[in-house]
From Swiss-Prot:
Transmembrane segments: none annotated. GO terms for cellular component: periplasmic space. The gene is cwlM. It comes from the Bacteria. It catalyses: Hydrolyzes the link between N-acetylmuramoyl residues and L-amino acid residues in certain cell-wall glycopeptides. It comes from Mycobacterium tuberculosis (strain ATCC 25618 / H37Rv). Residues 193-370 form the MurNAc-LAA domain. Pathway: Cell wall degradation; peptidoglycan degradation. Residues 18-83 are annotated as: Peptidoglycan-binding domain 1. This is N-acetylmuramoyl-L-alanine amidase CwlM. InterPro entries: Bact_Sporulation_Assoc, MurNAc-LAA_cat, Peptidoglycan-bd-like, PGBD-like_sf, PGBDSf. Belongs to the N-acetylmuramoyl-L-alanine amidase 3 family. It is found in: Periplasm. PANTHER family: N-ACETYLMURAMOYL-L-ALANINE AMIDASE LYTC, N-ACETYLMURAMOYL-L-ALANINE AMIDASE-RELATED. GO terms for molecular function: N-acetylmuramoyl-L-alanine amidase activity.
Amino acid sequence: MPSPRREDGDALRCGDRSAAVTEIRAALTALGMLDHQEEDLTTGRNVALELFDAQLDQAVRAFQQHRGLLVDGIVGEATYRALKEASYRLGARTLYHQFGAPLYGDDVATLQARLQDLGFYTGLVDGHFGLQTHNALMSYQREYGLAADGICGPETLRSLYFLSSRVSGGSPHAIREEELVRSSGPKLSGKRIIIDPGRGGVDHGLIAQGPAGPISEADLLWDLASRLEGRMAAIGMETHLSRPTNRSPSDAERAATANAVGADLMISLRCETQTSLAANGVASFHFGNSHGSVSTIGRNLADFIQREVVARTGLRDCRVHGRTWDLLRLTRMPTVQVDIGYITNPHDRGMLVSTQTRDAIAEGILAAVKRLYLLGKNDRPTGTFTFAELLAHELSVERAGRLGGS
């Protein structure tokens, strides 16, 4: 199947006409998301394959929804990449680990799923052939008497097809994530957290009018991150920011920073924008893809954060969603992105420029992290866990630990 190509930086949308549109149409047709349209059989007219028409727009939106992408009908970098990844089927190419330029695709995801069913792979089924996939493949090859070279070629494929039809299992990654949370205990002190404020550097985002004067979207998110960082540090957590004030790294760079720190959790803060001024509310996102792979702890934390922020601020509940954005799929720890409101909406904007609202959001996120590690024990109703109670609980856990060790 052909994979779409375009000039870097270009994005295609309804009404555009180019050769790249023909390739997008072919890619979606091969995936079964668009009918063959060389000729309209009802009228006998040829369809303009280079035209990005309304029917193609609907197919692109359906594809984006299925793949956990932003559903806007625009074929930009992320959607192009997803179309290319979706074009690969296991066996169509040789799979191996490429340092600096890892392979991505649905064929890699299928390989990961089969190795996971056989008990060799415990990571997320994310379609990324990294070191964890390489090591799992080599372990499988050694176990089954194959050349342990980490290359998924014809012989390894035949073996996998034979065994995969006989073995299926649960999600070792979910079990591993849950065990890490359980074994780390309910105490927040010592937990390592990456806080990721959006925008930064020359990317100021939109400017809002606050009580003390104009405030940019970047400054608003930085202020919220600082409030959250201060509360976490006061409770004994080890906190790191994903960027300085003068930089706006890409999502991949932010994920790399979190991985280098070896964080337990990553919490990303964003404002949402929309051309419609009516769009409003808060939403939280975790890793989840069309292969059925989900970050269980990421989903649990996103759910806690969503409920806490809604309860404390009264912002509209736009719910929790699984997505495949780089920030969520490239991090090696549970990661949640919180869109704290629509800065383009007058009501949300008026709330977000208020320091009281940002305090409430910061305390809600901290309470959500605490509830994640409590695992249901000594929990509080949503929206009622105060900062003073969190401090008191940390002291009681520390005191109990000292008494138990004496």
